[in-house]
């Protein structure tokens, strides 16, 4: 067991070549919440004893360039919690802007197809807000389709994901 303040200092110092202080601190608190289910408030209140091995292993992975989302297998996209691993790209903030733009346009289409769906982030975020719209996703990768389907089930969203090579196959 080790003091939380020391682990935080190890993270901020250990990640300073990759992230600025604020980003490193945010990553530490994300890891803290993921490992211990504790948040920044718990830290302030002094709940300070943690398992060092887990934090050390995560820090080593971060220093080796593995994104925190791949380590925890979690990310949030447009308020939709998603499972991610190295078989799909981590959704970017710019992609959230795309979803926001589509929603602002108030498109009256009854069907949307997300091509190259990956984790399913776009399709799932749109379906969550456009409940009366049929949203499907396609990808060439079996692993990506498994992850997208898992994310749909975990979020209780009715999105169908199909294997499709957009350069060779026909879309119906």
Named regions from a protein language model:
Residues 46, 104-105, 156:
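Short, flexible coil/linker elements and helix-boundary hinge sites characteristic
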Residues 38, 171-172:
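N-terminal processing/targeting junctions
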Residues 2-70:
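N-terminal auxiliary segments of SAM/dcSAM-dependent transferases
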Residues 57-130, 135-150, 161-164, 170:
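SAM-dependent Rossmann-like transferase core, predominantly class I methyltransferases
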Residues 26, 107, 157:
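Structured loop/turn residues at beta-strand edges in well-structured enzyme cores
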Residues 1, 21-22, 85, 112:
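A generic helix-loop boundary/linker signal
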């Amino acid at each position: 067991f080790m003091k939380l303040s020391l682990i935080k200092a190890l993270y901020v110092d250990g990640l300073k070549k990759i992230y600025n202080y604020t980003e490193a601190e945010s990553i530490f608190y994300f890891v803290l919440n993921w490992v211990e289910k504790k948040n920044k408030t718990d830290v302030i209140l002094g709940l300070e004893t943690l398992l060092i091995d887990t934090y050390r292993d995560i820090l080593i992975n971060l220093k080796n360039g593995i994104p925190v989302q791949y380590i925890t297998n979690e990310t949030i996209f447009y308020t939709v919690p998603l499972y991610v691993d190295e078989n799909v790209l981590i959704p970017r903030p710019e992609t959230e802007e795309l979803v926001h733009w589509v929603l602002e346009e108030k498109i009256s289409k009854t069907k949307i197809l997300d091509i190259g769906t990956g984790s399913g982030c776009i399709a799932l975020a749109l379906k969550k807000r456009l409940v009366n719209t049929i949203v499907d996703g396609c990808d060439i990768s079996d692993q990506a389709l498994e992850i997208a389907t898992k994310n749909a089930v975990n979020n209780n969203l009715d999105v169908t994901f199909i294997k499709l090579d957009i350069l060779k196959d026909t879309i119906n």
